[in-house]
From Swiss-Prot:
Protein name as annotated: Super small secreted glycoprotein
Organism expressing this protein natively: Zaire ebolavirus (strain Mayinga-76)
Presence of the UniProt keyword rRNA-binding in the record: no
Keyword S-adenosyl-L-methionine: no
Disulfide-linked positions: C108-C135, C121-C147
InterPro entries noted in UniProt: GPC_filovir-type_extra_dom (IPR002561)
Major subcellular site: secreted
Sugar-bearing residue positions: N40, N204, N228, N238, N257, N268
Gene from which the chain derives: GP
This protein's GO CC annotations: extracellular region
């Protein structure tokens, strides 16, 4: 049996921070790039042929595929909200499509879920499928669930983006971002459109911050995964946990972790200690993503 307590935290540690980013994208007037989005891997050869017949596209060499992350649309990225967008189904074969370039993701996910009998809920990644290579935060969820289905699909028809491959299903222990695959139509075939060399693969998922890329893994425990009664715990260590709430940003969880360590709030017994954050604590440190406008409470 675990022990639950109310965790009182210094409020001045969690002041609201906000920042704005103005992005100005300049295109030459003659540089027209129509954008098409592939939903559910439904782009067929016939669709490409129709585009070829129009004046914008004279050759399939003008097509360049890109992965676009859903978080850019402002979807909720906290673990309780994100996992509600995924569900298990049987009888539907998975589909995989490749893409040439992708965005950097603020939030990625990595699932290790087992059934109550100990068997795996998710399939292992096929050869050639590696984790999404650029994630600021990796939300790693371990736990159990009924997993009523052969594969976990996206309920809204999006893809799970891996390293230059997008799949309709989630693979066990493989980091992914939610997104869609789009294609750019270039005015003319340009071999140097993606001229930069591929970014080198991350080492153990985290590199020196001075390299311009830094990833942090945040760990959770889940029970009843995939059901309406799913419960999530933020893992401080293997005996100390915090009840997870949708309002907790990644930045808040990292400072919460530090506070629990420095204030001696970790479990000092062999039993599990579960904290609950005081509802009056302001948890709005940081942002879910720099482009998302946070809704103010009425």
């Amino acid at each position: 049996m675990g022990v639950t307590g109310i965790l009182q935290l210094p409020r001045d540690r969690f002041k609201r921070t906000s920042f704005f980013l103005w992005v100005i994208i300049l295109f030459q007037r003659t540089f027209s790039i129509p954008l098409g989005v592939i939903h559910n891997s439904t782009l067929q050869v016939s669709d490409v042929d129709k585009l070829v017949c129009r004046d914008k596209l004279s050759s399939t060499n003008q097509l360049r595929s890109v992965g676009l992350n859903l978080e850019g649309n402002g979807v909720a990225t906290d673990v309780p909200s994100a996992t509600k967008r995924w569900g298990f189904r049987s009888g539907v074969p998975p589909k995989v499509v490749n893409y040439e370039a992708g965005e950097w993701a603020e939030n990625c996910y990595n699932l290790e879920i087992k059934k109550p009998d100990g068997s795996e809920c998710l399939p292992a990644a096929p050869d050639g499928i590696r984790g999404f290579p650029r994630c600021r935060y990796v939300h790693k969820v371990s736990g159990t669930g009924p997993c009523a289905g052969d594969f976990a699909f996206h309920k809204e028809g999006a893809f799970f983006l891996y390293d230059r491959l997008a799949s309709t299903v989630i693979y066990r222990g493989t980091t992914f971002a939610e997104g869609v695959v789009a294609f750019l139509i270039l005015p003319q075939a340009k071999k140097d459109f993606f001229s930069s060399h591929p970014l080198r693969e991350p080492v153990n998922a985290t590199e020196d911050p001075s390299s311009g890329y830094y990833s942090t893994t945040i760990r959770y425990q889940a029970t009843g995964f995939g059901t309406n009664e799913t419960e999530y715990l933020f893992e401080v260590d293997n005996l100390t946990y915090v009840q997870l709430e949708s309002r907790f940003t990644p930045q808040f969880l990292l400072q919460l972790n530090e506070t629990i360590y420095t204030s001696g709030k970790r479990s000092n017994t062999t039993g599990k200690l579960i904290w609950k954050v005081n509802p009056e604590i302001d948890t709005t440190i940081g942002e879910w993503a720099f482009w998302e406008t946070k809704k103010k409470p009425h």
